[in-house]
Design a protein with these regions (language model features):
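A short coil-to-beta-strand element that immediately follows conserved catalytic motifs
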Residues: 110-119
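Conserved Nudix-box catalytic region and its N-terminal flanking loop in Nudix hydrolases
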Residues: 56-105
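Residue-level detector of short, conserved catalytic/binding motifs and their immediate flanks
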Residues: 42-45, 95, 135
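Nudix hydrolase/Nudix homology domain
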Residues: 30, 73-87, 119-124, 129-186
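Short, well-ordered strand-loop elements centered on a beta-strand within folded domains, enriched
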Residues: 54-63, 145-152
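A short, structured loop/turn motif at beta-sheet edges
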Residues: 52, 108-111
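Acidic, metal-coordinating catalytic segment for phosphate/diphosphate chemistry
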Residues: 6-54, 63-67
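Short N-terminal binding/cap micro-motifs at the start of the first secondary-structure element
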Residues: 1-5
Length: 186
């Protein structure tokens, strides 16, 4: 099981299923949970990658001031995603429905892709980190045919992972954790 951690933990199917267990999961108004670390808001965090090995590139952007989470404005990021909502529960797999909805809202992806679940992300060093639990997904694109749909994803595009690693301090904590994990896989 996942247990108590901070940072990045490799994916474990049993822990993931426990998180999604209806006996443990509930929908609450964001106003009730945004400042309460006893509740963890589940966030699919999708990383778009093209290429392989040292030549691979990740989609990255700067969060604009109109994006939902004010505490992350002006931060650089490699993750696309957002909150699972009650509306996502209408589908057969609420987590996947939420992830696909967030991707469709924020990105235009016009190429084939494959998916790998990398792991869990939790950052207890900041107020925003203490109330969210991320599930990092690596989306391997066949070609770099992806662009931001949402106008609040600014200065976006694909960059070599080595460049992102060199400038990792400009990125939000979750992105730093994922860049470190992916850089170690070269």
């Amino acid at each position: 099981m996942l247990g108590n951690f901070s940072g990045f933990v490799p994916f474990d199917q049993q822990s993931f299923e426990a998180i999604l267990d209806p006996d443990h999961m509930q929908f609450r108004p964001r106003s009730q949970v945004e400042e309460d670390p006893s509740f963890k808001q589940l966030i699919p965090y999708c990383i778009l990658q093209v290429g392989s090995g040292p030549e691979r590139r990740l989609f990255q952007y700067t969060r604009g001031s109109g994006q939902g989470e004010k505490r992350l404005h002006a931060k650089r990021s490699i993750g696309i995603g957002g909150h699972i909502s009650r509306e996502d529960a209408a589908g057969p797999d609420l987590y996947r429905c939420g992830m696909q909805r967030e991707l469709a809202e924020e990105m235009v992806i016009e190429t084939e892709l494959s998916e790998q679940v990398l792991g869990f992300i939790y950052d207890d060093s900041s107020p925003v980190g203490r109330v969210h639990l991320g599930v990092a997904h690596l989306l391997q694109l066949a070609a770099p045919n992806a662009r931001a749909r949402e106008s609040e994803l600014i200065d976006s595009g694909f960059s070599p992972i080595s460049e992102l690693f060199t400038h990792r301090d400009h990125f939000e904590t979750w992105s730093q954790l994922c860049i470190d994990e992916l850089e170690g896989r070269c």
